[in-house]
């Protein structure tokens, strides 16, 4: 094998194919008359359409339990529509109708906004405008927001905990914001659970914010309709990029925060079933000048935001360094840098690429030191192969670290490709601090995602472009179009990443520097924390793949 090529460079992306699809069988019975005769050569009658659920794809590999299958079945657009009708939202005249005794609130992640914008061939602002109108006018929602404030609060809390751990020298911390990685760790790597930060993701923090408002206003967040209660209920629907987020919403520690989780694919299917055209709600957006577009969008965002909340903040994200990660690792590095600069010392954040595209490390470097002193390290890591490698190195059960052959070509490539976030500092000192490639196991914090490339590659996103023939209503994509070949999927991902990086608004301040007045009232501390469930590891059980690559 060439010295420049090793198995560490192989990407673990596996495009969905026949090998990972549950075969479908349509059993048709012959229609036999009383005389014992039956006809041949006639067109068969249409039978019930066969569907494949997420549990079909995951349960076969042992990824989820039967109880988790039940949880997944409760998180679908069909379940939402049933609850929507049961709670009487279909009879409301408009958002805020006095006759509506219940309240529907909707949140959406920035990845989904970019995905829907690309799918319909419009910019993100136009997609936001149509999303707001659809959920206001069709579904009669009271509030529709991005999850930006919840994301900022989640990042803020993670950074605060990391700074506390830094003072106590507590070693590597792992994120728990990805349910796929969290479930995998709880079930198969119990010895790594103490390394997990128990700070909830943007989805659940946003849900906690909505829950606090509901309780203050006298609404019930229990939508189980016990005792026939169908009034003064708040229902929270969230739109996310990954299917494993459905399991996150079903965790006992998130009760009442999120009632239903769907993906953009399911939004498309839901609109198709209802005969609603998404394009119709773009209206005359394209004919308006930029100033008028922003004016109309701003008014609509303000109208659909809870009272006292900054609407612009909800539709923004914290700076993330690489352009499309969740920003936890980058914001921690920036906070350490700012604290170091405030103490009178020079410092800057530099990025160091890993051995594949799904690993990126941020190092806080003091360039004035001899040789360049590394003050702090944080890493963004995604994909199951990288997760396995990280777990092997961190697991204290005695796994030997596999020696990695470091050749001069790899070292020079790491230095050459490393990029600096700041322009100051001594080049030689910075170069010395960037020796080699990223090493997540030695970082203070690792932001982990099960999906290769993170949530921007979530399995629920719309990677294709909308067919031009969609005039009267939106047609759900056939399952055969999901994913496509690996090369085409990678091109679609790159286009989506570029749109996300260019069009999703980034807040000017870091989450830790935002004034309290700019953020919604912080929910109680316990509502922002997970409760971890540890399953004892069976040493005789092989380490099977329990995280799907395209959740």
From Swiss-Prot:
InterPro entries, A to Z: Cytosolic_Fe-S_CAF, Fe_hydrogenase, Fe_hydrogenase_lsu_C
Binding site residues for [4Fe-4S] cluster 2: 178, 242, 451
SUPFAM superfamilies tied to this protein: Fe-only hydrogenase
Molecular function GO terms recorded: 4 iron, 4 sulfur cluster binding; iron-sulfur cluster binding; metal ion binding
Residues that bind [4Fe-4S] cluster 1: 20, 57, 60, 63
Protein keywords: 4Fe-4S, Iron, Iron-sulfur, Metal-binding
GO terms of biological process kind: iron-sulfur cluster assembly
Bias (Polar residues) ranges: 421-431
Disordered: annotated segments: 395-435
Signal peptide start and end residues: none
Top-rank taxon: Eukaryota
Entry's Gene Ontology cellular component terms: cytosol; membrane
Any matching Pfam family: Fe_hyd_lg_C
Gene3D superfamilies: 3.40.50.1780, Fe-only Hydrogenase (Larger Subunit), Chain L, domain 3
Function comment: Component of the cytosolic Fe/S protein assembly machinery. Required for maturation of extramitochondrial Fe/S proteins. May play a role in the transfer of pre-assembled Fe/S clusters to target apoproteins.
Homology family: Belongs to the NARF family.
Listed name of the protein: Cytosolic Fe-S cluster assembly factor NAR1
Gene this chain is encoded by: NAR1
